């Protein structure tokens, strides 16, 4: 067989889309998942409108270019991980393939990712776009959580390659806690947490707004985002952390320098409590969202307790982090400590209730962090799409023409998965 061109791996998220070729360790492009379109006035001569429609369809921009176009309407076709506008999504994919990857879609197999609990109909829509609009030879739709588990094999903490584990996937728009057993997601036990990267940015923006007057209002969001990415970390104890800043501020308070976009003058702000209060909303969500008060460690514990009893220990032993919002320093350590406390308290209680007759075996809680965390889903896809099995499990154009889009409702597990 002639040497194949590598597969294209595309991971579409709420905030950013990661894309590149299989076999690489990092995505070639990371672009905002938005599209800017010309919204022409809907009044006027119908014939004129019909003429313009074809032109308007070609007049659009995606990614960073879309954000820089003030005269266009900027749309985000994906909300909370799920595609909401398929027409825009098709145009978005068109530019991804031709402008960014510069690929001829007929020559490359494609691995696309989907969020947990994606509907079978959505898989069919994806198949229709890929096979009919782009004429791809083969398509595989992978669940993001399974790819994140595969990516965690690069960690030194992982002894054996397993596809059983609890994935905490926290991106820009949503955080999911997803239990996976032998490569299959336990759908009924998934929980989502309405706190993610964007909420942390908004919370830091609010804190800075209350305290710092020097930030230009139109730049307050990007300043908050920069502060979050540059200075934020997770602390082990809130009270001690506050006292650290109060007693020795010079050591802990950082300076952020920015440039006013209008006057081009520099401005500087002090970054203090915001450094640890931002990511703290994972563990104390009530700081930012009064309607949701369950810390992430409790959600993880509840998810695992809802799972079948025979997979609970392996799920505790392999808690895998994925996505940009899990990148805060010491996030994994704090999560491991909090989950361990909850688990140990439960074991102690069961021992007390049995009057000391039951001696429960301790449960090993391990949170896996690794250097591929930020793009874990994309990297997992890149690894699996460069294996020979990938081409055997892909749905081909021939299958699609024979059976129809329903073939993409089911995508077999493969690799070390099986």
Swiss-Prot record:
InterPro entries: Actin (IPR004000), Actin/actin-like_CS (IPR020902), ATPase_NBD (IPR043129). Keywords: Actin-binding, ATP-binding, Cell projection, Cytoplasm, Cytoskeleton, Nucleotide-binding, Nucleus. Its main location: cytoplasm. Disulfide bonds: none annotated. It holds the Pfam family Actin. PROSITE patterns: ACTINS_ACT_LIKE. The keyword Mitochondrion does not apply. GO terms for molecular function: actin binding; ATP binding. The keyword Nucleus applies. It is found in: Cytoplasm, Cytoskeleton; Cell projection; Nucleus. GO terms for biological process: Arp2/3 complex-mediated actin nucleation. GO terms for cellular component: Arp2/3 protein complex; cell projection; cytoplasm; nucleus; site of double-strand break. It comes from the Eukaryota. Belongs to the actin family. ARP3 subfamily. PANTHER family: ACTIN. Component of the Arp2/3 complex composed of actr2/arp2, actr3/arp3, arpc1 (arpc1a or arpc1b), arpc2, arpc3, arpc4 and arpc5. ATP-binding component of the Arp2/3 complex, a multiprotein complex that mediates actin polymerization upon stimulation by nucleation-promoting factor (NPF). The Arp2/3 complex mediates the formation of branched actin networks in the cytoplasm, providing the force for cell motility. Seems to contact the pointed end of the daughter actin filament. In addition to its role in the cytoplasmic cytoskeleton, the Arp2/3 complex also promotes actin polymerization in the nucleus, thereby regulating gene transcription and repair of damaged DNA. This is Actin-related protein 3-A. It comes from Xenopus laevis. The lineage of its organism: Eukaryota, Metazoa, Chordata, Craniata, Vertebrata. The gene is actr3-a.
């Amino acid at each position: 067989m002639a040497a194949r061109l590598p597969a294209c791996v595309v991971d579409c998220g709420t905030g950013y889309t990661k894309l590149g070729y299989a076999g690489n360790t990092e995505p070639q492009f990371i672009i905002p998942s938005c599209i800017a379109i010309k919204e022409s006035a809907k009044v006027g001569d119908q014939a004129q409108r019909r003429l313009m429609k074809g032109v308007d369809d070609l007049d659009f921009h995606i990614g960073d270019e879309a954000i820089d176009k003030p005269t266009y309407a900027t749309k985000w076709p994906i909300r909370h991980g799920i595609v909401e506008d398929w027409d825009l999504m098709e145009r978005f994919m068109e530019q991804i393939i031709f402008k960014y990857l510069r690929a001829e879609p007929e020559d490359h197999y494609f691995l696309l990712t989907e969020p947990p609990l994606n509907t079978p109909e959505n898989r069919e829509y994806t198949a229709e776009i890929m096979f009919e609009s782009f004429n791809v030879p083969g398509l595989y739709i992978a669940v993001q959580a399974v790819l994140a588990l595969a990516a965690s094999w690069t960690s030194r903490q992982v002894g054996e390659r397993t596809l059983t584990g609890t994935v905490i996937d926290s991106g820009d728009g949503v955080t999911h806690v997803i239990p996976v057993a032998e490569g299959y997601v336990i759908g009924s036990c998934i929980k989502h947490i309405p706190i993610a990267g964007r909420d942390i940015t908004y919370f830091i923006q609010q804190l800075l707004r209350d305290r710092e007057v020097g930030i230009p209002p139109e730049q307050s969001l990007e300043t908050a985002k920069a502060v979050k990415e540059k200075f934020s970390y997770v602390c082990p104890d809130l009270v001690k952390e506050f006292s650290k800043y109060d007693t020795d501020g010079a050591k802990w308070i950082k300076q952020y320098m920015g440039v006013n976009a209008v006057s081009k003058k520099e401005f500087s702000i002090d970054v203090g409590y915001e450094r640890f209060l931002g990511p703290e909303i994972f563990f104390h969500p009530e700081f930012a969202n009064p309607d949701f008060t369950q810390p992430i460690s409790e959600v993880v514990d509840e998810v695992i307790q809802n799972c079948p009893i025979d997979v609970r220990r392996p799920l505790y032993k392999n808690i895998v982090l994925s996505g940009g919002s899990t990148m805060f320093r010491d996030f994994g350590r704090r999560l491991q400590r909090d989950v361990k406390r909850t688990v140990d308290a439960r074991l102690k209680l069961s021992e007390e209730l049995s009057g000391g007759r039951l001696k429960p075996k301790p449960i090993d809680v391990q949170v896996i962090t690794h250097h591929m965390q930020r793009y874990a889903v994309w990297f997992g896809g890149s690894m699996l799409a460069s294996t020979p099995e990938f081409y055997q499990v892909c749905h081909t154009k021939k299958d699609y023409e024979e059976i129809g889009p329903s073939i993409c409702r089911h995508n077999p597990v493969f690799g070390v998965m099986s």
